[in-house]
Amino acid sequence: GRTSRRQTLEFAESMNIQREMIYAQRDRLIYHNQGLDTVIDEVLDDFIDQAMAEEDFSKAENLYHFILRNISFRINEIPKDLDLKNREQVLELIYQFAYRELDAKKQELKTKELNEYFQRLSMLKAVDDNWVEQVDYLQQLQMAIGSQQLSQKNPIVEYYQEAYKGFEAMKRQIRKDMVRNLLLSQVQVTKKGDIISHFP
């Protein structure tokens, strides 16, 4: 009785903490006044740093596929004279394609307002899609751990640990989806001045 009530409250508290963090991130995107360029730079830097740490870019095909999947469909091949062992050269190539895509969207969308609207939409979509999945995951986790009453572990501690791991994984996925939405989307402006976006 009392234990399971307390457990339910603890589970709810964990979800509330995550929800507040997500809403703070959404608010930052919605009400951010100083252009979104600084936010986009941060997201790109974090995503690319993580890729540099986790991926093996000493093989040209790995670098090519990474750029094609996450940064730009416009890449034909990795330049032959690129030194794949040189971190700076690899970074420069990735950033070159990333900013080329951002500039292409600016050209396509013409006005600053439309471009910012597209950027905001791209990033909010990444946050919202992943948060919906995370809520679903937390509910399943709650049921799974709640049904393990007989295990030796403290269910609340176990829930918090798994929920935290899930939250960290979600933050990484949000970053990745933001980058892909911003760079790989196809955008066009209708005659009425509306944006049509096809997200990857």
Pin down the residues of each PLM region.
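Extended, charged helical/alpha-beta scaffold domains that provide interaction surfaces
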Residues: G1-P200
